[in-house]
A protein has these predicted regions:
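Conserved catalytic or metal-liganding residues and their short signature motifs at active sites
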Residues: 1-202
Length: 202
């Protein structure tokens, strides 16, 4: 009788463990979104846990959101870290939660277009970043910042090389300027400078 009870205890214990394992996988380890393509979640500086969940509800099912809410309640997300995070493409609910909680964001592709004015550039870049056009325009007209990079407010436009770069969505205006300055220096090799001079472009 005792042996029978032990076997029954082991059986039910194993059954409970199996059910919990399946539920855990179903809630936390399966894909957060059924979308095969990458879905970018943009977390603003004024977002909180509730507003993040509201954004995620647009791309996730109730089951996936239940897993995310359980993690938020048990583990917690005291400090919201702004940035751009992948919420599709097969990422699990647990991985997405860890990325958002830890601030492990995904870089975005920033395209520098051919435009006529710095105002146009600020407007176009603001569509791709958290920065708004006013913040970008302010950086472009910041005399001290421009001088620090070797330009002035009338020549700073020469620093922006039309191309596509990877940057963090919530990059600051100053860090963006420093990054584009680095890209400009990398572009203008001695050979390119000589070619530009020969063509009368400098």
């Amino acid at each position: 009788m005792k042996e029978f009870c032990n076997k029954r205890t082991i059986f039910y214990g194993g059954l409970v463990a199996l059910i919990l394992g399946i539920a855990g996988y179903w809630l936390f380890l399966s894909s957060f979104s059924s979308a095969k393509e990458e879905i970018m979640l943009r977390v603003d500086r004024d977002d909180n846990c509730d507003s993040i969940q509201a954004k995620l509800e647009r791309v996730a099912s109730p089951r996936q959101m239940l897993g995310f809410r359980i993690l938020s309640g048990v583990v917690g997300m005291k400090k919201v870290r702004p940035g751009c995070y992948i919420a599709g493409g097969g990422i699990s609910t647990l991985a997405l939660f860890r990325n958002i909680r830890g601030g492990r964001q995904t870089p975005v592709k920033l395209t520098i277009p051919n435009v006529r004015t710095l105002g146009d550039l600020a407007a176009r870049l603001s569509l791709q970043l958290e920065l708004d056009s006013a913040q970008l325009a302010s950086a472009f007209s910041d005399e001290a910042l421009c001088q620090e990079l070797g330009y002035d407010t009338t020549t700073i436009g020469c620093m922006f090389i039309p191309n596509t770069y990877e940057v963090f969505w919530n990059i600051s205006a100053k860090d963006l300027m420093a990054r584009l300055h680095k890209e400009s220096n990398a572009f203008w090799t001695s050979k390119r400078k000589a070619e530009a001079k020969a063509a009368g472009l400098t």
